[in-house]
Amino acid sequence: MSINATARALLLTEFVSAFFLTMRYFFQPKATINYPFEKNPISPRFRGEHALRRYPNGEERCIACKLCEAICPAQAITIEAGPRRNDGTRRTVRYDIDMVKCIYCGLCQEACPVDAIVEGPNFEFATETREELYYDKAKLLANGDRWEREIAKAIELDAPYR
């Protein structure tokens, strides 16, 4: 070992320089947030938990066109259309999304001509079993009812870019 290397090892110069570097950043404001108690604002384009929307009169928006089912790359959406009603429109009898398969790409939302299926702002939907991640029509409509205000605001903010 050379004298220079021995001197550096004895004086712990690397340790001291690392200590001063740590002290320099120690007194600066924190760059992180205290997550469960503080949350960053999310983008209007954020893709979270799926929801089915309703019209203001309470009627569901989905017209059973099955475009979302056809475009889904993960084949996570299953739709069964009911018979045509007297006014010629159709509604879904069954609308299921397998959230385990879903890759949250947003193609279903883009394909929907009536903005019925959307990916809402909720990202905290952890479950204890896989079966709870199979969303049926009732669960999706409940999500839509719960998050309608935030979803409508996000769609309005994103409208100039659509």
From Swiss-Prot:
Its main location: membrane. GO terms for biological process: aerobic respiration. It catalyses: a quinone + NADH + 5 H(+)(in) = a quinol + NAD(+) + 4 H(+)(out). Keywords: 4Fe-4S, Cell inner membrane, Cell membrane, Iron, Iron-sulfur, Membrane, Metal-binding, NAD, Quinone, Repeat, Translocase, Ubiquinone. InterPro entries: 4Fe4S_Fe-S-bd (IPR017896), 4Fe4S_Fe_S_CS (IPR017900), NADH_quinone_OxRdtase_chainI (IPR010226). Residues 52-82, 93-122 form the 4Fe-4S ferredoxin-type domain. Belongs to the complex I 23 kDa subunit family. NDH-1 is composed of 14 different subunits. Subunits NuoA, H, J, K, L, M, N constitute the membrane sector of the complex. This is NADH-quinone oxidoreductase subunit I.
